[in-house]
A protein has these predicted regions:
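Glycine-rich phosphate-binding loop of nucleotide-binding enzymes
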Residues: 120-203, 482, 512-516, 524-525
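Conserved AAA+ ATPase small/helical "lid" subdomain
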Residues: 229-250, 470-501
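Basic- and hydrophobic-enriched, low-structure N-terminal and domain-boundary segments
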Residues: 1-149, 377-380, 395
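Conserved beta-strand position immediately N-terminal to the Walker
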Residues: 146, 348, 423
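Conserved ATP-driven motor cores of ASCE-family P-loop NTPases powering translocation/secretion/packaging/pilus
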Residues: 219, 409-414, 418-494
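Conserved P-loop NTPase motor module
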Residues: 273, 477-576
Length: 576
């Protein structure tokens, strides 16, 4: 697009450069309407180019009435390209000189700066001129990760929804996986979202690595060393047993070549095994032990595994624990939308999962996202969005689940090499691991009222931008100061307002809209039933008819019998 700029001399707010220090210029400005203020953009005439800078300080000129002095940080320039068309580019090839003229940028200049390339997407409007769309470069934003920071109740969730909808619109080859910590984004993307709830999630226990599985077994508490050693020894054997049993059915002569104890599987190999096989191995070991204390370790471990298997809250892990089946490819395709079928984004709802396993589940999906990118050589670009990021990658190394932090840090540091990009969302950036957030080169800073959060934000930006951060405590609803690789200049913007149907659930709640009358007893009973159901107790209200106790699922006995059956089959094949 060709832009013809009006001469600076005819522009309002004409000023003159009277001091220069590096890329900073001091400009004498007349008292004009509208007056220049902090955050405004100025254009400086510099030969065939116009230097573009942002006002970071304004004060009265002492000896000259009706004039003010502005300090401007120069950040880019508008220059003609080979075809004579004006283009904006970041950085400068020349510096301002004493006597150069300056003026407030026109709407035409602002549009030129923010028009971007073919992959640019509109996410809102500029605070300085609401007629000018605020556009971001999706390629630059995704390639070097991004973060959205803001206190609760400032429109952060709707801002995230606007950004992700822009990704879906303008980058159809990018799949999006979002961790939804409060189950509020299900309706933000319409029919394009694949919503995975705790009831529909399928994440078999054998896809967990050892650290993740142990964290589930012990509910986030410290593990017992003796029991961990038992798992370390027998999980690889159980994997070998599953493979051997599979070969018995598919290749009778191949089965005798597989020794389950020498199958080559490691503790972390993501291959199926049956929980009853693992239990049978532990039970067999317990039967050979004479030391009561050692036997108790086996007994307690078996009890833990049986409790998990029979707990309906863990059905997403153990529903088919004794059925088998290698479903890893199908699960990866479903979670990461490898075959989108019109739904390129997965919204994984975490509220409703057992609180003690949420960290492990997040760790699993983050690790799987990176590993799939690694082994697929980045053929399927994936944006991994982590809400409540300070919970899963805390700055305090003694808090949280260490492997989850490492999984997110691995994506932050190396993910872009394999087409895995990171988007972080947090209301407490000061509690987020500084190494993780330092890898995010595009930041959207919404209102932050906590001084520690503001201090961290100031430390994360250059001195030129630091003055703009002073706006952060007073930003309005849906407003943000955005800066970094995804934007041409540090920008104060207002995110696009979503329709009522697309708003995150947290932003549709209004106290005045809620019923204030007495609660109906039937409604309260329904709430209690849902409450108990989420804890695995089922419906137990007084109106429910008594039900016979369910028959306990066969566990150790069947597993031991299966082990003996498998050995007999292998020996029989060997003799024949």
């Amino acid at each position: 697009m060709t832009h013809s700029s009006a001469p600076l001399a005819s522009s309002p707010g004409l000023g003159v450069v009277f001091g220069v220090r590096g890329a900073q210029a001091r400009i004498s400005l007349p008292r004009a309407e509208p007056p220049a203020t902090v955050g405004d953009f100025l254009a400086l005439a510099c030969g065939p180019r116009r230097l573009i800078g942002v006002v970071t300080e304004v004060e009265s000129e002492r000896d000259v009435p009706n004039r003010s002095v502005a300090r401007v940080d120069v950040m880019g320039e508008i220059v003609p390209d080979a075809q004579g068309r004006e283009r904006f580019r970041r950085g400068v090839s020349a510096y301002p000189a004493i006597g150069d003229e300056a003026r407030l940028m026109t709407a035409q200049d602002l549009r030129l700066v923010y028009e971007g390339d073919a992959n640019a997407a509109t996410i809102g409007t500029l605070h300085h001129d609401e007629s000018v769309p605020a556009r971001i470069s999706l390629t630059d934003m995704l390639d070097k990760h991004f973060a959205v920071l803001g206190s609760t109740g400032v429109g952060k969730s709707s801002g995230v929804a606007v950004i992700l909808n822009a990704v879906l619109d303008k980058a159809p080859n990018v799949r999006v996986f979002m961790l939804d910590g409060h189950n509020e984004f299900a309706h933000c993307f319409g029919a394009r979202a694949n919503v995975v709830s705790p009831r529909t999630l399928k994440l078999p226990f054998w896809m967990f690595n050892f650290e993740e599985f142990v964290d589930v077994v012990y509910g986030g508490r410290p593990a017992i060393d003796e029991e961990m050693e038992i798992l370390l020894e027998y999980i690889p054997v159980a994997k070998g047993m599953y493979l051997a049993q599979k070969l018995v059915h598919n290749d009778p002569y191949g089965a005798r070549k597989i020794d389950p104890r020498r199958s080559g599987f490691t503790i972390d190999t993501p291959t199926p095994y049956l929980l009853q096989d693992l239990a049978g191995l532990i039970d067999e070991r317990m039967g050979k032990l004479e030391n009561r204390a050692t036997r108790m370790h086996c007994h307690r471990l078996l009890s833990r595994l049986e409790t998990l298997q029979n707990d309906p809250r863990y059905g997403f892990m153990f529903e088919d624990a004794n059925v088998g089946g290698d479903t890893m490819a199908e699960i990866l395709s479903h979670l990461f939308r490898l075959d989108p079928q019109g739904k390129p984004i997965t919204v994984m709802q975490l509220a409703g999962l057992p609180a003690e396993v949420v960290d492990a589940v997040v760790c699993v999906v983050a690790r799987l996202a990176f590993d799939f990118g690694l082994w697929s050589e980045g053929r399927f670009p994936l944006l991994f969005v982590c809400e409540e990021a300070h919970r899963f990658a805390p700055a305090d190394r003694t808090a949280g689940f260490g492997p989850t932090r490492r999984a997110l840090l691995r994506i932050a540091k190396e993910g872009r090499k394999y087409g895995v990009y990171l988007g972080l969302v947090t209301q407490r950036p000061s509690e987020l691991d500084p190494t993780v957030i330092s890898q995010c080169n595009t930041l959207f800073a919404m209102r932050l009222s906590n001084e520690r959060d503001q201090a961290l934000l100031r430390s994360a930006v250059s001195d030129e931008i630091a003055n703009l951060i002073s706006f952060v405590p007073s930003l309005g609803m849906r407003e943000a100061v955005a800066f970094g690789e995804g934007l041409p200049l540090p920008t104060r913007l207002r995110f696009t307002e979503l329709s009522q149907e697309q708003l995150p659930r947290s932003e549709t709640y209004r106290l005045e809209d809620r019923a204030m009358g007495p609660a109906d007893r039937g409604f309260v009973r329904q709430v209690v039933d849902r409450w108990r159901g989420s804890l695995g107790a089922g419906r137990v209200s007084e109106e429910a008819a008594p039900q016979p106790a369910p028959t306990p699922a066969p566990f150790v006995n069947d597993a031991a019998a299966r082990l003996e059956q498998l050995r007999a089959q292998i020996l029989k094949r060997g003799v024949s």
